[in-house]
């Protein structure tokens, strides 16, 4: 019977080959309308770098720390924490929806300080998330579902590229406020205040807690104070993104200053945290999302809804990275070592900034490069124009994003002179 049916099929298509007949009988594609998406701008830089055979090539696009030999760096405190965890021979059972409790508690304590009134009163809730991106998305989903007063979220201009799709895909309406001043490669306080004064009440405003990405430009404490007062006057909901605590200045308290100050001034903030950079746990995806509430009862209600949001997305977070971070944060000797290592990473980046400016002067550059050392954190907005970036890529095999942002973590004692020479060549 099967053979009969097969022969009928073949005869019905006349002189066509059996292969063509089978292809015609297949269902048409469901996905003919799907267009090819654009490549990720950061990953595209890395792919081009990999194809380059120039021995002097530099990849200044990727936001991951490198040591002074240009190699990936695993912290000693992380290795020791891993050894302690392995020795315990722990199980691999599911974590609760909200994550590892020891981690969540230590995570928010690191951000707010262990003696913060918010923690003592129990009026905050922290859930473990899938690093900073996961934290932002859970936060965006929460705001989208429960902040009925406004669908608008105001991002600094510019902001981290992923902020836009995270909030957009959560159903928020994207707006912007002035932040960066291209003429000075610094912070535009007047522009920021002017724009914030016009933001409709109860809108959401996103703030980078420290080491603004991509510019490396942070407000000074007195500027933060002006912003906090105006934001409170405008009755805006503050969403802090803190991906670089300790990694910016080398001091965890200094880097968390803005977050703590806003809370002191009565802002019930949302807070996203990541341990990718400051613990080097990039692939472990360790983060936290915190909501500061009116009181403990409100915090419990918020927690219940966060769990409901998390459950259909990833059910519960991964445990290994959270165990590592919790072990470091809760073990005094490891915590002390980690603080030293964080400062060491931050200090190396600061030193590379200084060496770059020094070598630019040696090259004879007459441009003002003070913004390179004024900026803070992993990234530097160089002020280079797109055509200058193209020359750096094509003539010197120095790869970066088109906006002139460089990852200072990719600069080393061995290649900083070459970088300065190349920048001078395209800017003189």
Curated annotation (Swiss-Prot):
Disulphide-bonded residues: none
An example Gene Ontology biological process: aspartate catabolic process
Pfam families: Aminotran_1_2 (PF00155)
Catalyzed chemical reaction(s): L-aspartate + 2-oxoglutarate = oxaloacetate + L-glutamate; L-kynurenine + 2-oxoglutarate = kynurenate + L-glutamate + H2O
Protein name (Swiss-Prot/TrEMBL): Aspartate aminotransferase, mitochondrial
Transit peptide (first-last residue): 1-27
N6-(pyridoxal phosphate)lysine modification, residue list: 277
Database matches in SUPFAM superfamilies: PLP-dependent transferases
InterPro entries, per the entry: Aminotransferase_I/II_large, Asp_trans, NHTrfase_class1_PyrdxlP-BS, PyrdxlP-dep_Trfase, PyrdxlP-dep_Trfase_major, PyrdxlP-dep_Trfase_small
Family stated for the protein in its record: Belongs to the class-I pyridoxal-phosphate-dependent aminotransferase family.
Residues that hold substrate according to the record: 63, 160, 213, 405
Root EC class: transferase
Null allele phenotype: Morpholino knockdown of the protein results in brain developmental defects. Morphants show a small head and seizure-like electroencephalography spikes. Additional defects include slow circulation, bend body and pericardial edema.
Keywords for this protein: Aminotransferase, Cell membrane, Membrane, Mitochondrion, Pyridoxal phosphate, Transferase, Transit peptide
Role, per record: Catalyzes the irreversible transamination of the L-tryptophan metabolite L-kynurenine to form kynurenic acid (KA). As a member of the malate-aspartate shuttle, it has a key role in the intracellular NAD(H) redox balance. Is important for metabolite exchange between mitochondria and cytosol, and for amino acid metabolism.
Further information: In eukaryotes there are cytoplasmic, mitochondrial and chloroplastic isozymes.
Molecular function terms from GO: kynurenine-oxoglutarate transaminase activity; L-aspartate:2-oxoglutarate aminotransferase activity; pyridoxal phosphate binding
Stored NCBIfam families: PRK09257.1 (NF006719)
Keyword Mitochondrion assigned: yes
Top-level taxon of the source organism: Eukaryota
Quaternary structure and interacting proteins, as annotated: Homodimer.
EC assignment: 2.6.1.1, 2.6.1.7
Cofactor(s) needed: pyridoxal 5'-phosphate
């Amino acid at each position: 019977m099967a053979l009969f049916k097969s022969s009928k099929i073949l005869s019905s298509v006349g002189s066509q080959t059996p292969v063509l007949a089978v292809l015609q009988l297949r269902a048409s594609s469901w996905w003919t309308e799907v267009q090819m998406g654009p490549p990720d701008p950061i990953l595209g830089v890395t792919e081009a770098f990999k194809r380059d055979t120039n021995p002097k090539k530099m990849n200044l696009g990727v936001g991951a720390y490198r040591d002074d030999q240009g190699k990936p760096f695993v912290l000693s405190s992380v290795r020791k924490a891993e050894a302690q965890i392995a020795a315990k021979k722990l199980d691999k059972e599911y974590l609760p929806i909200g994550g590892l409790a020891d981690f969540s508690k230590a995570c928010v304590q690191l951000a707010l300080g262990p003696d913060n009134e918010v923690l003592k009163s129990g009026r905050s809730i922290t859930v473990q998330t899938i690093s900073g991106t996961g934290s932002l998305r859970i936060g965006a989903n929460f705001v989208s579902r429960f902040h009925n007063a406004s669908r608008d979220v105001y991002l600094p201009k510019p902001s981290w590229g992923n902020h836009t799709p995270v909030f957009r895909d959560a159903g928020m309406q994207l707006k912007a406020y002035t932040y960066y001043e291209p003429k000075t490669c610094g912070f535009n306080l007047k522009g920021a205040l002017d724009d914030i004064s016009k933001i409709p009440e109860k809108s959401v405003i996103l703030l980078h807690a420290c080491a603004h990405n991509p510019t490396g430009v942070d407000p000074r404490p007195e500027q933060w104070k002006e912003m906090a007062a105006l934001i409170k006057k405008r009755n805006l909901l503050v969403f802090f993104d803190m991906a670089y605590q300790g990694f910016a200045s080398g001091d965890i308290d200094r880097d968390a200053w803005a977050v703590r100050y806003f809370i002191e001034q009565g802002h019930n903030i949302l807070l996203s945290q990541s341990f990718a950079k400051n613990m080097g746990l990039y692939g472990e995806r360790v983060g936290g999302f915190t909501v500061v509430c009116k009181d403990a009862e409100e915090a419990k209600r918020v927690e219940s809804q966060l769990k409901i949001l998390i459950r259909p997305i990833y059910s519960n977070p991964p445990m290994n990275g959270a165990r590592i971070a919790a072990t470091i944060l809760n073990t005094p000797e490891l915590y002390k070592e980690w603080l030293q290592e964080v400062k060491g990473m931050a200090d190396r980046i600061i030193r590379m900034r200084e060496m770059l400016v020094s070598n630019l002067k040696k090259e004879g550059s007459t441009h003002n490069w003070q913004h390179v050392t004024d900026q803070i954190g992993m990234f530097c907005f160089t002020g280079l124009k797109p055509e200058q970036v193209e020359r750096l890529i094509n003539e010197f095999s120095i790869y970066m994003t088109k906006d002139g942002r460089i990852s200072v973590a990719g600069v080393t004692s061995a290649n900083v002179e070459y970088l300065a020479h190349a920048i001078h060549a395209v800017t003189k």
